[in-house]
Design a protein with these regions (language model features):
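Short cysteine/histidine-rich metal-coordination sites, predominantly Zn2+-binding motifs
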Residues: 77-94, 130-143, 162-170, 227-244
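Intrinsically disordered, low-complexity linkers and tails
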Residues: 1-40, 50-56, 93-95, 103-104, ...
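Ferredoxin-like iron-sulfur electron-transfer modules
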Residues: 47-63, 95-116, 126-147, 159-165, ...
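Short, structured motif recognition centered on aromatic/hydrophobic residues
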Residues: 22-24, 59-62, 71-73, 121, ...
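Short Fe-S-cluster ligation motifs
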Residues: 16, 26, 91-121, 140-162, ...
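C-terminal functional regions that serve as terminal interaction/effector modules
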Residues: 193, 209-213, 219, 225-229, ...
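Iron-sulfur cluster-binding cysteine motifs and their immediate structural context
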Residues: 70-81, 115-133, 144-161, 220-231
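Short gly/acidic/polar-rich coil/turn motifs that serve as flexible hinges in modular proteins
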Residues: 65-67, 215-217
Length: 256
Protein backbone atom coordinates (compact mmCIF):
# COMPACT_ATOMS: atom_id res chain seq x y z
CA UNK A 1 0.00 0.00 0.00
CA UNK A 2 1.35 3.41 -0.96
CA UNK A 3 2.68 5.57 1.89
CA UNK A 4 0.37 8.37 2.97
CA UNK A 5 3.12 10.72 4.13
CA UNK A 6 4.51 13.73 2.27
CA UNK A 7 7.21 16.37 2.65
CA UNK A 8 4.87 18.57 4.70
CA UNK A 9 4.73 15.84 7.36
CA UNK A 10 8.50 15.75 7.89
CA UNK A 11 8.36 17.78 11.11
CA UNK A 12 6.01 15.24 12.68
CA UNK A 13 7.47 12.02 13.98
CA UNK A 14 7.52 9.70 16.96
CA UNK A 15 10.72 8.25 18.41
CA UNK A 16 10.35 5.15 20.56
CA UNK A 17 12.90 5.07 23.36
CA UNK A 18 14.31 1.67 24.26
CA UNK A 19 13.03 1.34 27.82
CA UNK A 20 10.94 4.46 28.11
CA UNK A 21 8.34 6.74 26.54
CA UNK A 22 7.35 7.84 23.08
CA UNK A 23 9.07 11.10 22.13
CA UNK A 24 6.63 13.05 19.98
CA UNK A 25 7.89 15.78 17.66
CA UNK A 26 5.85 18.54 16.03
CA UNK A 27 2.53 17.94 17.80
CA UNK A 28 1.07 20.80 19.85
CA UNK A 29 -1.94 19.06 21.41
CA UNK A 30 -3.11 15.56 22.33
CA UNK A 31 -6.89 15.18 22.13
CA UNK A 32 -9.29 12.65 23.59
CA UNK A 33 -11.44 10.80 21.04
CA UNK A 34 -14.37 9.17 22.83
CA UNK A 35 -16.11 6.20 21.18
CA UNK A 36 -19.87 6.80 21.10
CA UNK A 37 -22.41 4.10 20.14
CA UNK A 38 -25.33 4.17 17.71
CA UNK A 39 -28.89 3.33 18.76
CA UNK A 40 -28.03 -0.38 18.66
CA UNK A 41 -25.10 0.02 21.03
CA UNK A 42 -22.42 -0.46 18.34
CA UNK A 43 -19.40 1.84 18.05
CA UNK A 44 -20.27 4.51 15.51
CA UNK A 45 -18.66 7.94 15.99
CA UNK A 46 -15.89 9.67 17.92
CA UNK A 47 -16.68 12.60 20.17
CA UNK A 48 -14.00 15.13 21.05
CA UNK A 49 -13.02 15.24 24.72
CA UNK A 50 -10.32 16.93 26.73
CA UNK A 51 -7.33 18.57 25.03
CA UNK A 52 -3.83 18.23 26.50
CA UNK A 53 -1.27 20.85 25.48
CA UNK A 54 2.24 19.63 24.70
CA UNK A 55 4.60 21.90 26.64
CA UNK A 56 7.81 20.86 24.91
CA UNK A 57 9.16 19.56 21.61
CA UNK A 58 9.62 16.67 21.83
CA UNK A 59 6.93 15.72 24.31
CA UNK A 60 7.29 12.42 26.18
CA UNK A 61 4.13 10.29 26.20
CA UNK A 62 3.69 7.34 28.56
CA UNK A 63 3.89 3.87 27.02
CA UNK A 64 4.35 1.77 30.19
CA UNK A 65 0.81 2.50 31.41
CA UNK A 66 1.88 3.54 34.91
CA UNK A 67 2.41 7.30 34.71
CA UNK A 68 0.48 9.40 37.20
CA UNK A 69 0.57 12.27 34.70
CA UNK A 70 -1.08 10.52 31.73
CA UNK A 71 -0.93 10.97 28.83
CA UNK A 72 2.54 12.30 29.63
CA UNK A 73 5.51 10.36 30.97
CA UNK A 74 6.50 10.97 34.61
CA UNK A 75 9.39 8.50 34.76
CA UNK A 76 7.32 5.62 36.15
CA UNK A 77 8.71 3.27 33.48
CA UNK A 78 11.98 3.13 35.43
CA UNK A 79 10.25 2.17 38.69
CA UNK A 80 7.79 -0.53 37.62
CA UNK A 81 7.97 -3.96 36.03
CA UNK A 82 6.93 -3.98 32.39
CA UNK A 83 8.23 -5.29 29.07
CA UNK A 84 9.18 -2.43 26.71
CA UNK A 85 10.49 -4.69 23.93
CA UNK A 86 9.30 -3.97 20.40
CA UNK A 87 8.18 -7.14 18.64
CA UNK A 88 6.03 -5.87 15.76
CA UNK A 89 6.92 -6.51 12.14
CA UNK A 90 8.10 -3.67 9.93
CA UNK A 91 6.67 -5.37 6.82
CA UNK A 92 3.91 -3.93 4.69
CA UNK A 93 0.69 -4.57 6.63
CA UNK A 94 -0.94 -6.11 3.54
CA UNK A 95 1.47 -9.05 3.73
CA UNK A 96 -0.22 -10.59 6.77
CA UNK A 97 -3.79 -9.79 5.79
CA UNK A 98 -6.75 -11.98 4.98
CA UNK A 99 -8.96 -10.91 2.08
CA UNK A 100 -12.69 -10.52 1.45
CA UNK A 101 -13.89 -9.52 -2.03
CA UNK A 102 -16.84 -8.21 -3.96
CA UNK A 103 -17.09 -6.70 -7.42
CA UNK A 104 -16.50 -3.22 -6.03
CA UNK A 105 -14.18 -3.73 -3.06
CA UNK A 106 -11.35 -5.86 -1.72
CA UNK A 107 -11.12 -5.77 2.07
CA UNK A 108 -7.72 -6.53 3.61
CA UNK A 109 -7.72 -7.49 7.28
CA UNK A 110 -4.52 -7.61 9.37
CA UNK A 111 -5.85 -9.03 12.63
CA UNK A 112 -2.57 -8.51 14.50
CA UNK A 113 -3.31 -4.78 14.50
CA UNK A 114 -6.80 -4.99 16.03
CA UNK A 115 -7.34 -2.39 18.76
CA UNK A 116 -10.91 -3.55 19.53
CA UNK A 117 -12.65 -0.28 18.69
CA UNK A 118 -15.44 -2.38 17.10
CA UNK A 119 -16.61 0.08 14.44
CA UNK A 120 -16.44 -2.86 12.05
CA UNK A 121 -19.29 -4.67 13.85
CA UNK A 122 -22.20 -2.36 13.02
CA UNK A 123 -24.84 -3.39 10.46
CA UNK A 124 -23.80 -7.03 10.51
CA UNK A 125 -20.07 -6.43 10.17
CA UNK A 126 -17.95 -4.86 7.46
CA UNK A 127 -16.89 -8.26 6.05
CA UNK A 128 -20.49 -9.22 5.33
CA UNK A 129 -21.24 -5.74 4.00
CA UNK A 130 -18.38 -6.04 1.50
CA UNK A 131 -19.29 -9.55 0.36
CA UNK A 132 -22.99 -8.76 -0.09
CA UNK A 133 -22.70 -5.28 -1.56
CA UNK A 134 -25.15 -5.66 -4.44
CA UNK A 135 -25.61 -2.50 -6.51
CA UNK A 136 -23.11 -0.74 -4.17
CA UNK A 137 -25.90 -0.21 -1.63
CA UNK A 138 -23.49 -0.53 1.31
CA UNK A 139 -20.71 1.75 0.04
CA UNK A 140 -21.32 4.58 2.51
CA UNK A 141 -21.52 2.33 5.57
CA UNK A 142 -18.45 0.35 4.48
CA UNK A 143 -16.36 3.49 4.03
CA UNK A 144 -17.59 4.87 7.36
CA UNK A 145 -16.55 1.72 9.22
CA UNK A 146 -13.14 1.64 7.54
CA UNK A 147 -12.49 5.32 8.26
CA UNK A 148 -13.27 4.81 11.95
CA UNK A 149 -11.02 1.74 12.33
CA UNK A 150 -8.21 3.54 14.20
CA UNK A 151 -5.47 0.93 13.88
CA UNK A 152 -5.58 0.52 10.11
CA UNK A 153 -6.28 -3.18 10.61
CA UNK A 154 -8.92 -2.89 7.89
CA UNK A 155 -7.88 -1.54 4.48
CA UNK A 156 -10.32 -1.06 1.62
CA UNK A 157 -9.35 -1.25 -2.05
CA UNK A 158 -11.74 0.02 -4.72
CA UNK A 159 -11.45 -2.56 -7.50
CA UNK A 160 -13.23 -0.47 -10.11
CA UNK A 161 -11.36 2.78 -9.56
CA UNK A 162 -8.01 1.29 -8.54
CA UNK A 163 -7.19 2.95 -5.22
CA UNK A 164 -7.16 2.34 -1.46
CA UNK A 165 -9.84 4.30 0.33
CA UNK A 166 -8.40 6.36 3.19
CA UNK A 167 -9.99 9.22 5.12
CA UNK A 168 -8.16 12.54 4.98
CA UNK A 169 -6.39 13.14 8.28
CA UNK A 170 -4.05 15.93 9.28
CA UNK A 171 -1.07 14.73 11.35
CA UNK A 172 -2.35 14.34 14.91
CA UNK A 173 -2.30 12.11 17.98
CA UNK A 174 -5.36 11.25 20.07
CA UNK A 175 -6.22 9.24 23.17
CA UNK A 176 -8.99 6.75 22.48
CA UNK A 177 -11.50 6.44 25.31
CA UNK A 178 -14.16 3.74 25.06
CA UNK A 179 -17.34 5.04 26.71
CA UNK A 180 -19.22 1.82 25.89
CA UNK A 181 -17.09 -0.60 27.90
CA UNK A 182 -15.45 2.02 30.18
CA UNK A 183 -11.90 1.22 29.07
CA UNK A 184 -9.09 3.54 27.97
CA UNK A 185 -7.68 2.66 24.57
CA UNK A 186 -4.46 3.28 22.67
CA UNK A 187 -2.81 6.32 21.18
CA UNK A 188 -4.35 7.01 17.78
CA UNK A 189 -1.72 8.30 15.36
CA UNK A 190 -3.22 9.85 12.23
CA UNK A 191 -2.07 11.43 9.02
CA UNK A 192 1.06 9.53 8.02
CA UNK A 193 3.31 10.35 10.98
CA UNK A 194 6.66 8.56 10.85
CA UNK A 195 7.33 6.19 13.75
CA UNK A 196 10.98 5.44 14.47
CA UNK A 197 11.93 2.31 16.38
CA UNK A 198 14.37 2.39 19.28
CA UNK A 199 16.86 0.70 16.93
CA UNK A 200 16.73 3.67 14.53
CA UNK A 201 14.72 2.00 11.76
CA UNK A 202 11.25 3.09 10.70
CA UNK A 203 7.94 1.28 10.76
CA UNK A 204 5.78 1.45 7.66
CA UNK A 205 4.24 4.92 7.44
CA UNK A 206 0.45 4.66 7.52
CA UNK A 207 -2.54 6.97 7.76
CA UNK A 208 -4.10 5.12 10.71
CA UNK A 209 -2.00 3.61 13.50
CA UNK A 210 -2.67 2.74 17.14
CA UNK A 211 0.21 2.62 19.61
CA UNK A 212 0.07 0.75 22.91
CA UNK A 213 -0.12 2.92 26.02
CA UNK A 214 -1.21 0.31 28.57
CA UNK A 215 2.21 -1.38 28.46
CA UNK A 216 0.72 -4.85 27.94
CA UNK A 217 0.70 -5.34 24.16
CA UNK A 218 2.56 -8.34 22.77
CA UNK A 219 2.89 -6.55 19.43
CA UNK A 220 4.65 -3.39 20.60
CA UNK A 221 4.76 -0.63 19.70
CA UNK A 222 1.31 -1.30 18.25
CA UNK A 223 -1.86 -1.93 20.20
CA UNK A 224 -3.11 -5.54 20.20
CA UNK A 225 -6.24 -4.96 22.36
CA UNK A 226 -4.44 -5.86 25.59
CA UNK A 227 -5.94 -2.77 27.23
CA UNK A 228 -9.28 -4.61 27.14
CA UNK A 229 -8.06 -7.67 29.03
CA UNK A 230 -6.04 -5.62 31.53
CA UNK A 231 -8.95 -3.21 32.14
CA UNK A 232 -6.70 -0.25 31.44
CA UNK A 233 -8.10 3.03 32.71
CA UNK A 234 -6.23 6.32 32.55
CA UNK A 235 -8.94 7.96 34.73
CA UNK A 236 -9.02 10.94 32.39
CA UNK A 237 -12.62 10.26 31.40
CA UNK A 238 -13.62 10.47 35.07
CA UNK A 239 -11.78 13.78 35.42
CA UNK A 240 -13.53 15.15 32.35
CA UNK A 241 -16.97 14.09 33.64
CA UNK A 242 -16.28 15.67 37.04
CA UNK A 243 -15.15 18.89 35.33
CA UNK A 244 -18.34 19.04 33.24
CA UNK A 245 -20.47 18.33 36.33
CA UNK A 246 -18.73 21.14 38.25
CA UNK A 247 -19.23 23.57 35.37
CA UNK A 248 -22.94 22.68 35.23
CA UNK A 249 -23.33 23.27 38.98
CA UNK A 250 -21.62 26.66 38.67
CA UNK A 251 -23.97 27.62 35.83
CA UNK A 252 -26.99 26.60 37.93
CA UNK A 253 -25.80 28.78 40.81
CA UNK A 254 -25.31 31.75 38.47
CA UNK A 255 -28.88 31.53 37.15
CA UNK A 256 -30.54 30.97 40.53
Amino acid sequence: MKSTTNDNNAKYYIKITKDGPYLVYGISNINQEIIVPDDDGESWIYEKGKKFACQSNPTALCRCGHSNEKPFCDGSHSKVQWNPKETASKENVLNNSTVAKSDTFTLYDNQELCSYARFCDAYGGVWSLVKHNSHNANNGVIEHEIAHCPSGRLMLYNNKEGYFYEPKFDPSISLIEDSIIKISGPLWVKGGIRIESSDGTNYEIRNRVTLCRCGKSKNKPFCDSSHIFSNFNDHLMKEEKEKIKTEMLIEEEVYQ
